[in-house]
Amino acid sequence: MADLSVKQLAIEVGTPVDRLVQQFKDAGLNKDADAMVTEHEKQALLEHLKKQHGADNAEPKRMTLQRKTKGTLSVPGAGGKNKEVQIEVRKSKTYVHRSVIDEAQQQKEAEEKARQEAEKTRQEELAKAEQARKDAEAKARKEAEEKARKEAEARKQSTEAAADDAAKSPDEKARKVKAEADKRADENAKREAEALRKKQEEEAQRKTELEAQRKTELEAQRIAEEARRLAVENEGRWAAEEEARRRAELTDDVGEAASKFVKEAEAERERQDESKGRRRTGVVKAKKSPHEEAREERNSRARKGKRAKVHTPNSMQHGFQKPAQPVNRDIVVGETISVGELAQKMAVKAVEVIKVMMKMGAMATINQIIDQETAQLVAEEMGHKVTLRRENELEEAVLQDRDSTATREGRAPVVTIMGHVDHGKTSLLDYIRKAKVASGEAGGITQHIGAYHVDTENGSITFLDTPGHAAFTAMRARGAQATDIVVLVVAADDGVMPQTVEAIQHAKAAGVPIVVAVNKVDKPDADPDRVMNELTRYSVIPEEWGGENQFVKVSAKSGEGIDNLLNAILLQSEVLELGAVRDAMASGVVIESRLDKGRGPVATVLVQEGTLHQGDIVLCGFEYGRVRAMRDELGRSIDAAGPSIPVEILGLSGVPSAGDEATVVRDEKKAREVALYRQGKFRDVKLARQQKAKLENMFANMTEGEVSELNVVLKADVQGSVEAIADSLNKLSTDEVKVRIIGSGVGGITETDASLAAASNAIVLGFNVRADASARKIIESESIDLRYYSVIYDLIDEVRQAMSGMLAPEYKQQIIGLAEVRDVFRSPKFGAVAGCMVTEGTVKRNSPIRVLRDNVVIYEGELESLRRFKDDVPEVKNGYECGIAVKNYNDVRPGDQIEVYETVEIQRTL
């Protein structure tokens, strides 16, 4: 706020100028009417006025509020009549000013600080005393050593002198006496030095203990004084708390007094029942009522000095009356709801809801999630009124809180290159970009959506390169939805192929104009006219023939017709009048996403509206986050990206799904809430859409256990490849073998993936990714089948072979020989023995046989004996005679035929 003069301030606060000047003067500020007043001077004046009027002591430090609530309590009385009892409930609540709490906290901190300082001082004193004791000991030891050294020197000198005297004197006895005297003198000197040292040590220790005791007594006195001061200060607060506790006890006594009438009524009724029973059955032993027993127990506890609440049972009569007719309710149903929650809203048992659903043809459990439409039908069937609720109000509010008032400007067209596999889409784009991208694609085919921004002489164009393989249908559809113009590439030597037709269908479904590029016109067998004729069958008619589609003949190898193609694209964009808001919050679509090992989740976003800046908060499907970094298609860091510009963004919470809308929002907290709501909604809707266990398909569910399953853990480098491969593998499933993808994701193969594959007996497929060291260790120890691929054809073919190996084998009976019965003989060992001539193939003894009579099978069994002459033989070939005994069959007649066959296993394929 700008500074004001005294006169202006007086007008603003509504006081006379003279009075305001006097107040400034009282506050120690000399001001006249025209002087300027600063914020600091205003604050000083305000503090002076507060002190003058006693504002510091005006507000209370503690306030107690008392509340009385009056009501009535209906209790049963004598004769079955209810009696109204007036009751009053008193409550009190004490509020303490924040300054009191702050002062107590500051006081506590000061006490703790003083205690720490005292402890520190005591430790320092103890350390000093210990150091002094050590110094005294060292000094005493040094003095004793010095004294002993001097005495030793003196003794040595005296000993030498005595030795000289002894040498001179012939008296040996005098020398010995002198030596003993020296020895005693040495010992006396040592004892005196030791006694002196001990005395000095004891004196130093005594001084240290006295000093520590004095410090401890001083600290105890200070703490006692502090406790007395706190007791004096908190005496009022403790009194208020005691008063509040007393009032609470008084309230409990009032409640007990109010319930006294209930207890007395119960006792009166029980006494009446006892008197009636006594009149009917005679004398009955007197029995105390529960109220009397409770009263005696309470009195006994009161005598012991203990206070306890006694809970007495109320009347056994139910207060609930069954409704005379069904109650129709107004219920609110969200987008998904469980059967149990729906039953709770309708106030019925869940079993009743399940019965109604079974009558309507659907089976459900109590915890099963059902959709909004099903819940509405069930509730209306049971007679309730249903209100449908939208749960995405927060999401709509967040997405509508955007800048949309800016003017629209022209933008570059977004062009998608589509066509059949290996028709030259990426090579055509390479020539335009002057970069060799096709060589970087595995197998020479595009397996990702590549987004590129190209600046030409006539304007800028953004290209999206889509795959042509059949497995990448979703990626092509995604590219068509995010584009303005579709360039349909058709090889002049190959013509219209299945993916060409599919690309036309995607473009027409998205309502996008098509520009046809007839590629490979430089080949000798190129036939552009045939391509034009074939495309007319799919409503793609050249302008030369009266249609709306431009046809351009190009060669991605030589560059022929490239400029004409770019001019055709720019001409088509001018017709469309493309525009976008540039100075606004950005929005776009996720073209591709992946998990980078060093950078985390990376999403390729095509900006469609506004400008995306580094640091913006992006809501993208189930994920959200702040844009930490942005890179263009060449890997260069950029700070902003306008409309029709593809960028890679880093900073999302997870890998978004390709095709999700990316929107810049204002609040990161709300973005997180919307993302979590979308995740929960997706999970509930997925559960609600699962196939319901209806009565008519129960038998089909019973036979599912016979189907073999191939468990697969799939990891790829980008999200689009995961979707395409998973869709292709699911399409390989048959009635006998099913592909079950138990785990899929973006990024390298981790230890978790390997553990999952080991637990579920699955194979691990890696598409342009590799396993880390920990995962390889588990794969080797568990003998898991791990395979790497870089081309989708190889992956699908090998999975198909693995599924073929899981098919149940097929068995076929193959006839290997035929013998005609010429005569029948009798044998005591075998019974009837047929004398036969082998007419076809070979008759083998261990093979099963059939007996035919008039070309009709009359018996099926096995041979018991096969002989030629009298020798047992393993087989008899065509043109030879033999004797055949059929096991457990004696009705063989001449003219019968014995057919020999074997069962052959045939391996099946998908």
From Swiss-Prot:
Keyword Phosphoprotein attributed: no
Annotated region (Disordered), positions in chain: 51-322
Binding positions for GTP per the UniProt entry: 419-426, 465-469, 519-522
Principal localisation: cytoplasm
Basic residues composition bias: residue spans: 277-288, 301-310
Protein location: Cytoplasm
Listed Pfam families: EF-G_D2 (PF22042), GTP_EFTU (PF00009), GTP_EFTU_D2 (PF03144), IF-2 (PF11987), IF2_assoc (PF08364), IF2_N (PF04760)
Bias (Basic and acidic residues) ranges: 51-62, 81-91, 99-158, 165-250, 261-276, 289-300
GO cellular component, one term: cytosol
Region feature G2, mapped onto this chain: 444-448
HAMAP family, A to Z: IF_2_B
Name this protein carries in UniProt: Translation initiation factor IF-2
